[in-house]
Amino acid sequence: AMFREVVPEQAIKLQGEGLRAVLANRYLLLIAAIACFSQLVEPLVEYQFLSAIAERFSDTEARSRFIGSFFSVMGGVAIAINVLVTPVLHRYLGTLAGLAAQPLNVVLATCGFVAQPGIMSASVMKIADRGLSYSINRASRETLYINVDPLLTYQAKAWIDMFGYRTFKVFGSGLILTILAFSPAARVGYDLAWLTLLICAFWIAAVVVLGREQQRLLLRNPRPANAVP
């Protein structure tokens, strides 16, 4: 009985505090922005990937085999990047280079998909998105909280991970439905690709602004970022 009464109240309080922490802190707001842009792009890339598979394989069993093999490869790529690439990139180019790696690679892969649509280019685009999201992007994003007060980190991460991710993923799905409703069938893939490029442009811009904000914090306030106007 005690848990049924206390846990919902704590969850509501945490959600409110997390949102207030993000909105009141420019640094945390930028962290939330890059995390949410990542989730906004995911359903767009996923739709194009699954559409390419459906076009290539008419047999359900063949699709299942391909998807199973693909995700095994993508998991291996993510592990290899985390072990071999992420430490080197962070050491020589810094955290922001790690944050920029995913949107830049998604841009390149999407351009390849626009130039040559098909299952191979769609697979490369999927790996550029989720393969880097599960490895270098996540590792880079976690290091951003080092300069933040632990309580603010707890509140902000709770909101970003539990609410922000889901909200923007749903919003991304809504964008797909909008494209499907208003674009000719032959242009859906291209329109989704161009929309992906547009979101990545805002994503990269947010990373650049975040880098400047991080430098400003380090120069003006070496202490944890409790309150950034």
Would you name each region that the model predicts?
Residues 1-229:
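Membrane-embedded alpha-helical bundles of multi-pass transporters/translocases
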